[in-house]
């Protein structure tokens, strides 16, 4: 809904189809969003529409305390990332801001992806063959990814615990400049 911009109401059925969720899941989610004061609903014929109370950055600011960090676990690997992975973390931020590129590239991969089974985790302290860090995500980053990178909102949530002032400053600037 944050990426919907000013395009108007979202039909629940369409949201469920687009996100690969059941109508029951969307109904539960919309009930939670209503309780948080982020949306209202109205009936349009047989369809139920969700309408956000705000749009763009203002909606993000209202919602961010309710959003989750998508990263369940980060592992280090010595192989090139799988084609199902997306540039994430400081690597993604560095490509969109003035932040320097991290020494080790960071990618996101859905934790339930078949590609995860083929990865061999290594200890970055002992293995010099480190190629990348893989963030295993709670949901598929492909849902919102753009141009081979994770989406901005998921990126912001994944970096929310990062205490580096440079990272937070660049992230804030990126969020404010983003064309919602």
Question: How should these model regions be labeled?
Answer:
Residues 20-35:
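Short amphipathic alpha-helical interaction segments
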Residues 34-45:
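A short, conserved structural fragment
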Residues 62-180:
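Long, low-complexity, charge-rich intrinsically disordered regions
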Residues 10, 45-46:
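Short gly/pro-enriched beta-turn/loop segments at secondary-structure junctions
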Residues 6-19:
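Short acidic, hydrophobic short linear motifs in intrinsically disordered regions
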Residues 46-54:
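Minor-groove-contacting beta-hairpin "wing" of winged helix-turn-helix DNA-binding domains
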């Amino acid at each position: 809904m944050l990426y919907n911009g000013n395009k108007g109401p979202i039909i629940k059925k369409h949201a469920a189809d687009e996100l690969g969720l059941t109508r029951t899941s969307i109904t539960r989610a919309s009930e939670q969003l209503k309780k948080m004061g982020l949306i209202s609903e109205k009936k349009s014929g047989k369809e139920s529409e969700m309408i956000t109370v705000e749009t763009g950055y203002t909606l993000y600011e209202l919602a961010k305390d309710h959003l989750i960090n998508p990263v369940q676990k980060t592992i280090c690997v010595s192989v090139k990332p799988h084609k199902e992975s997306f540039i994430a973390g400081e690597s993604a931020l560095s490509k969109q801001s003035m932040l320097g590129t991290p020494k080790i590239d960071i990618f996101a991969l859905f934790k339930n992806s078949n590609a995860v089974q083929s990865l061999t985790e290594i200890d970055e302290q002992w293995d010099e063959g480190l190629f990348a860090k893989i963030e295993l995500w709670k949901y598929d980053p492909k849902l919102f990814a753009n141009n081979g990178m994770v989406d901005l909102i998921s990126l912001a949530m994944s970096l929310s615990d990062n205490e580096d002032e440079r990272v937070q400053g660049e992230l804030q600037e990126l969020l404010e400049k983003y064309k919602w």
